[in-house]
Amino acid sequence: MVSGRGLVVTAKMLNAKKKELQDLLDVRIPENSREIGRALELGDLRENAEYKAAREEQTRLNNMVTRLQEEIERAQVFDPTTVVAGRVSFGTVISLKNHTSGEDETYTILGPWESAPERGIISYMSPLGSNLLNRKTGEQLAFTVGEHEKVYEILSISAAEI
């Protein structure tokens, strides 16, 4: 599913991240440069809180650009037609029996960019997601997160609508 240091993503999320990068480069960094210029006009840089804040923001924005560029470079767009029925992978919906809590749970396995645990979307890189990968319906798995042991049984696997 993931080759080398690749990052599996949906086409929609890759486009969103490219737009976010463009916004940083075309809007936010130029705005920050203007803020630095205005702060410089205030004089003494040793006691210039506006200048210091603008420079800190510049560092933060540049770090965001670097991180996004690296992640976009690593991104591999997921092809939904590659989902294998009956095997957990990126792009599947998994119904589980949580034997630790006794509850039934349902998750969609996507990437870290799409992850929204509060909506039942988990990353294939998360502790649960990575332990589920390549497993089949009916399999049980047990793993530890921190000091808590988790025990699950896979009830069903289906293709997610992406």
From Swiss-Prot:
InterPro entries: GreA/GreB_C_sf (IPR036953), TF_GreA/GreB_CS (IPR018151), Tscrpt_elong_fac_GreA (IPR006359), Tscrpt_elong_fac_GreA/B (IPR028624), Tscrpt_elong_fac_GreA/B_C (IPR001437), Tscrpt_elong_fac_GreA/B_fam (IPR023459), Tscrpt_elong_fac_GreA/B_N (IPR022691), Tscrpt_elong_fac_GreA/B_N_sf (IPR036805). The keyword Mitochondrion does not apply. The keyword Transcription regulation applies. It comes from the Bacteria. Signal peptide: none annotated. Residues 46-77 form a coiled coil. Belongs to the GreA/GreB family. This is Transcription elongation factor GreA. It comes from Treponema pallidum (strain Nichols).
